[in-house]
Structure formats: C-alpha cells, structure tokens
C-alpha cells in the first residue's frame, strides 16, 4: 500500500516535470534569431513598397552583442537587392534570383527579436555607386560605404 502511494506521488511529479518541459521551450520559441528578425524586416519592406519587384537580403552586417531581452530594440544594418520576381506574385524573396543591375538599398534601424511585440524602425536608401568593391550610399553630403574592399 505504501509503495502504491509512493509510486502515485512519483507519477504526479513526473507529470509536472513533463508539463514544465513542454511549456518552457514554447515560451523561448517566441524569440526570433537576429537573421529571422531581419528577414521579417525585408518582408515588411516588400509589403510597404510601391516598386514593381521584390527585394531580397544581399548582405547582413554583424549582429549586436547578445541581449537577454528579446523585446529590446536591436540596432540592425543590412543591404537588399532587387529581384526578378514581381511584387504581386507574393513569392518568398529567398526563392527569387537577383535582377541583373537591380537596385541596391542599404537599410539601417532597429528590430526586436520578440515575435509578439514586433516593432520595426527601418530606413532604406538606394546605394549610389560602387567604390573599390564596396557599396556606397549618400544622405545629403555624407556618404557611407559598406562591404569588403
């Protein structure tokens, strides 16, 4: 009788531990990776664009230092390039080829890794040219160059 009671108690604890194990990963699964957050920003850029073709991620700058809070805005910098896919097709940009001589845009701003909050603040400017193998864009009198070179 005593062993039945102990077995029943152990079974309850096992059940609680199993439920806890199922709940904890699902809570952390709501956090995006830095790359996923940027890809979501590219999707938003394509949704809000009035241009004929979709843009696809071309280059992603280094992520900022790790921050434990997925809701804290993270600085982001990336480059997108025009693809051959027309915007109305709603095809995932990752499946589209880059357009030869397509437009290139440098994007900067902030993203969050929280799937629920999702505030984005991204500004993209068309790259003005190539200097020594690096993409350059200008805002007023100031030019920024990114990439290798």
Swiss-Prot record:
Entry keyword Secreted: yes
GO biological process: antimicrobial humoral immune response mediated by antimicrobial peptide; defense response to Gram-negative bacterium; defense response to Gram-positive bacterium; innate immune response
SS bonds (residue pairs): 85-96, 107-124, 136-145, 138-143
Gene3D superfamilies reported for this sequence: 3.10.450.10
Propeptide: 30-130
Region (Disordered): 61-80
Entry GO CC: extracellular space
Molecular function GO labels: lipopolysaccharide binding
Sorted UniProt keywords: Amidation, Antibiotic, Antimicrobial, Disulfide bond, Secreted, Signal
Signal peptide region: 1-29
Main location: secreted
Keyword Disulfide bond among UniProt keywords: yes
Highest rank taxon of the organism: Eukaryota
InterPro entries cross-referenced by the UniProt entry: Cathelicidin-like (IPR001894), Cathelicidin_CS (IPR018216), Cystatin_sf (IPR046350)
Residues annotated with Arginine amide modification: 148
Location in or out of the cell: Secreted
Role played: Microbicidal activity.
Family of this protein: Belongs to the cathelicidin family.
Protein name: Protegrin-4
The gene coding this protein: NPG4
């Amino acid at each position: 009788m005593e062993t039945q009671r102990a077995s029943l108690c152990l079974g309850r604890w096992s059940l609680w531990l199993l439920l806890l194990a199922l709940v904890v990963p699902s809570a952390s699964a709501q956090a995006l990776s830095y790359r996923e957050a940027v890809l979501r920003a590219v999707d938003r850029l394509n949704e809000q664009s009035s241009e004929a073709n979709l843009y696809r991620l071309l280059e992603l700058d280094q992520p900022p230092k790790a921050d434990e809070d997925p809701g804290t805005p993270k600085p982001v910098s990336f480059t997108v390039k025009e693809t051959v896919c027309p915007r109305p097709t709603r095809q995932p940009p990752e499946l589209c080829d880059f357009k030869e001589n397509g437009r290139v845009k440098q994007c900067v701003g902030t993203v969050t890794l929280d799937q629920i909050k999702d505030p984005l603040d991204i500004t993209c400017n068309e790259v003005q040219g190539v200097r020594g193998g690096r993409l350059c864009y200008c805002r007023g009198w100031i030019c920024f160059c990114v990439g290798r070179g």
